[in-house]
Structures are given as structure tokens and as C-alpha cells.
């Protein structure tokens, strides 16, 4: 069995034999400062009865596991994976682990606000970190539906990919149950929890989309929600029209999170942002407003390209990211006040790609992603900006109208 470094060959083998139906994920984040309770009930099919494989599961210890009603011995748990023997045509797997909060932004991150000592949680799944939050087959092509339940302190908010179905009080804590998600990859599932301050609006386009913006209570006074909502609405109107397809998910929340390694993350309906990119604590330049709008639109573009349609394996990471990069600049110019954004792309983003291309670590745009560690090394200017530049050239070559028509056929 692998550790955390899943190989392409291992992923392909699982994909050839498994089809995942649904996950019922239960998290209890009231059990301590270092660990939390995590349970996955997974239903899935296997095309080759008798086949053996593994599920990704990272934790301090295995509490219990059953496969089709039979207990799995704890010796089958490595701390990163759980071995599964003799699968049937249809299977039900239940795994409970004592999972570990992340301090590095991978999995379920736990941070403490120094202003008021309040605790804030958020998940980060890309590339293969969601296994740190709940047991799953953590690869992009093994999609499924998800039912999330979270037990949290009574004064907290809890946000996930889908709207809340039911909220109840259990032993002085709140139990949040969310509606079932559409079919999606594990890496874009999300849970965010804590005493977040929030504000809400709605976009009315091809359908009504409830929208929320969340941040730490101590930052809320700095949140310019009107500007963020305005860019978000402009993005929805533009992408729904250009892509020819309504937004596929049920809501759209944007959350500023602390100690974040990335600029933002396109979790379906639950987008997380580095705080300083979304919330400005002081007066900033127009360039910063442009950068924020670009990030908002980049993540929104992923709702179609990446979340709705998804790469089979991380070999196509470049297309996932370069398409969102190209789309965000197109939307900036054609749907927002930032009409000169292509000049910024040429001056900044392409130069980023030029610099990276001159290093000994340069690589083809479409890199050979043999395993997860290789993928991690390729979130760079070549994957994003050089790839977007090539797409921009392609659009110029085939013609914008032809390219957009092809996209609409693809999404349909």
C-alpha cells in the first residue's frame, strides 16, 4: 500500500475497478485541540469481485472499520491507508478514525485568532489532502455524491459545498446536516467552521444562486462586501452566457481563511481565499482590486472547468489551471471595470512564466505527473501563465467564436 504519495499507476488501477456511489461523512470537531472524530460510510461498486485495494485514510488511530458488515483488523491500517480485501460487486465500507488537525494548511486546518482566541477551521483538499479530513478514494476521477454532517460548538457557523438541510442541538452542541452534493471529486469537497462573521446576497440569472461572504469576526469591519458581490455577479452573468450552461451547484460562498498556502481554492460552492486577497485592512491600489477580481473570477471559472468537468488524473493540471487563468482575464476585460487586464497579464503573468522557464526546474506545460509529489512541484508559472498564453494563442488561431462554440458543446 502507498503512503501519502499516490502514484498514477495505483490510481489507474483503482479507477479501472471501482465506481463510487456516495459518501456519508460525519465530523465531530468538539473532541479536542489536536484531533477530531471522522467517519466515512462509503458505498461503491467493484467490477471484479475478489479484488483487493486500499482507501486513503490519514489519522492518529483507527477507531473501527467494517467492510460489508465484517470488521477490518487494525493491522490493515498504516496511518495513511486502509487495506480492503475481497471486494464484492456492491460494497458498503464504514471507517472511523481519530484524525489530526493540520498546522500546515493540508487537510482540516485549525487556527486561533490572536485577537479574541477564537478557533477557525477550514479544509484544503487539493491535491490529495482531503484524505486527512475523512477516509476516501482520493483521486480526481473517482467522483461521488457526498452527505456531510458536522458536530460543532453552538456559537459556530459551519459551511460546506451544499446548503444546510437541518440544524439541531445535541448535548449542547450544534449538529449541521447538509443536502447531498452533485457528483464531484473528493479534492473539491470542503468544510469550513468557526465563529465566522458573514453577509449574504443573491444572484438571479439562469437560476437563483444564494451567495455568502465569510471572514473572521475581527476582520469583518474591513470587509467591502458590496464590491465583492458586484464582481461575483458580473462573473456569473458572463460565464453562464459564454459557457452556455447554468452554474451547476446550489449556492456560492466565498470565505477568507487564515494561514492559507494558496491564493484561493475552488471548492464547489464553498470557495476559500487567502485573507489578504479578499479582505483589505487598509487603503489599497487599483492593482490590488484588479488582482482580487481576477482571483474571484479564476475560482468561479473552475466551477465549470475543473469542478463540473474534471481531469482524469493530474497530468491535465495545466489545462485545468491555464483555462481558469485565461477565462478570468477574459471576464475581467469583458465583464468588469478592469478593461486593461490583458496588459497586466502580459506584463506580470507572462513574465512569471518566462522566469520559471529559465530555471533548471523548467518542464513542459503538459508535465508527466507520475505521482502526487510530482504534481505538487508543478503549481507554477508554466502550468498557469504559460499554459494560459498558449490557450490565448489557440483562441486567436481558431477564432474566438469557434473556440467558444466548442466550449459550449463540451460543457453540454
Which ranges hold each PLM region?
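Acidic/His-enriched low-complexity segments
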Residues: 1-250, 379-381, 396-398
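Hydrophobic alpha-helical and helix-loop surface patches within well-folded domains
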Residues: 178, 213-412
Amino acid at each position: 500500500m502507498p503512503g501519502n504519495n499516490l502514484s498514477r499507476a495505483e490510481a489507474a488501477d483503482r479507477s479501472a475497478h471501482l465506481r463510487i456511489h456516495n459518501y456519508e461523512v460525519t465530523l465531530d470537531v468538539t473532541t479536542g485541540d489536536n484531533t477530531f472524530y471522522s467517519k466515512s460510510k462509503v458505498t461503491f461498486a467493484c467490477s471484479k469481485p475478489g479484488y483487493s485495494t486500499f482507501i486513503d485514510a490519514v489519522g492518529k488511530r483507527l477507531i473501527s472499520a467494517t467492510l460489508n458488515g465484517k470488521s477490518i483488523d487494525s493491522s490493515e491500517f498504516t496511518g495513511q491507508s486502509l487495506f480492503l480485501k475481497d471486494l464484492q460487486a456492491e460494497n458498503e465500507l464504514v471507517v472511523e478514525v481519530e484524525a489530526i488537525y493540520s498546522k500546515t494548511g493540508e487537510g482540516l486546518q485549525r487556527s486561533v485568532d490572536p485577537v479574541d482566541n477564537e478557533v477557525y477551521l477550514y479544509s484544503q483538499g487539493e491535491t490529495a489532502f482531503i484524505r486527512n479530513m475523512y477516509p476516501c478514494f482520493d483521486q480526481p476521477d473517482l467522483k461521488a455524491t457526498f452527505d456531510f454532517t458536522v458536530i460543532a460548538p453552538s456559537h459556530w457557523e459551519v459551511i460546506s459545498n451544499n446548503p444546510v438541510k437541518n440544524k439541531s442541538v445535541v448535548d449542547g452542541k450544534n449538529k449541521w446536516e447538509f443536502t447531498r452534493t452533485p457528483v464531484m471529486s473528493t479534492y473539491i469537497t470542503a468544510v469550513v467552521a468557526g465563529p465566522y462573521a458573514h453577509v449574504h446576497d443573491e444572484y438571479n440569472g439562469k437560476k437563483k444562486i444564494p451567495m455568502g461572504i465569510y471572514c473572521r469576526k475581527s476582520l469583518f469591519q474591513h470587509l467591502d462586501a458590496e464590491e465583492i458581490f458586484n464582481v461575483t455577479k458580473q462573473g456569473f452573468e458572463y460565464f453562464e452566457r459564454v459557457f452556455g450552461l447554468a452554474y451547476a451547484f446550489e449556492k456560492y460562498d466565498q470565505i477568507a481563511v487564515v494561514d492559507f498556502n494558496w491564493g484561493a481554492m475552488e471548492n464547489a460552492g464553498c470557495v476559500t481565499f487567502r485573507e489578504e486577497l479578499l479582505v483589505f485592512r487598509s487603503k489599497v491600489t487599483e492593482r490590488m482590486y484588479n488582482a482580487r477580481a481576477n482571483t474571484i473570477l479564476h475560482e468561479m471559472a473552475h466551477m465549470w472547468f475543473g469542478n463540473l468537468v474534471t481531469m482524469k488524473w493530474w497530468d491535465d493540471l495545466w489545462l485545468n489551471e491555464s483555462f481558469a487563468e485565461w477565462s478570468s482575464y477574459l471576464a475581467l476585460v469583458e465583464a468588469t471595470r478592469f478593461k486593461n487586464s490583458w496588459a497586466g497579464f502580459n506584463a506580470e503573468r507572462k513574465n512569471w512564466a518566462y522566469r520559471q522557464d529559465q530555471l533548471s526546474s523548467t518542464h513542459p506545460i503538459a508535465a508527466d505527473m507520475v505521482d502526487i509529489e510530482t504534481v505538487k512541484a508543478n503549481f507554477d508559472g508554466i502550468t498557469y501563465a504559460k499554459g494560459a498564453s498558449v490557450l490565448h494563442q489557440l483562441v486567436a488561431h481558431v477564432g474566438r467564436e469557434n473556440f467558444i462554440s466548442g466550449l459550449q458543446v463540451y460543457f453540454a
